[in-house]
């Protein structure tokens, strides 16, 4: 259910109107399929969690190995990682454009995510990428960056 937000907030009643405004901009209305899937996941327990975690860890470890030597922020969990494009004298948006144009790699610049210095970071999501598609991504990234410096 990557990207689908299902949950609740427990807070003092005085904070709820402000939280509702924040959630409106940060959380997409839950799709019916997500609500159904969340209900089933809650009832089924944690049986598949270890298997899913192992798959995501394998993808993470492969992409980290592929991008070795680049300014990557190693994730402790989740299904994405950040590259510090600023240390390569680029913005995240510039690096995103170069990777898309020269290597057919789609990655998200972090300038709109509200983090401090977000414009210097680029996000790679590997959640649903099969290992076969991740293999070789390091060479593709390096070639695209080299083209950008020519």
Q: How should each PLM-predicted stretch be described?
A:
Residues 1-150:
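PLP-dependent class I/II
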């Amino acid at each position: 259910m990557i990207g689908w937000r299902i949950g609740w907030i427990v807070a003092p009643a005085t904070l709820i109107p402000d939280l509702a405004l924040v959630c409106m901009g940060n959380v997409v209305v839950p799709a019916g399929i997500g609500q159904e899937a969340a209900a089933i996941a809650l009832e089924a327990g944690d049986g598949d969690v270890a298997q899913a975690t192992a798959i995501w860890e394998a993808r993470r470890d492969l992409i980290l190995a592929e991008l070795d030597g680049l300014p990557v922020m190693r994730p402790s969990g989740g299904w994405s990682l950040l590259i510090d494009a600023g240390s390569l004298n680029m913005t995240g948006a510039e690096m995103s454009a170069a990777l898309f144009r020269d290597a057919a790699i789609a990655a998200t610049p972090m300038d709109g995510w509200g983090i401090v210095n977000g414009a210097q970071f680029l996000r790679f999501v590997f959640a649903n990428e099969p290992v076969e598609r991740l293999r070789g991504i390091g060479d593709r990234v390096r070639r695209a960056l080299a083209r950008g410096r020519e």
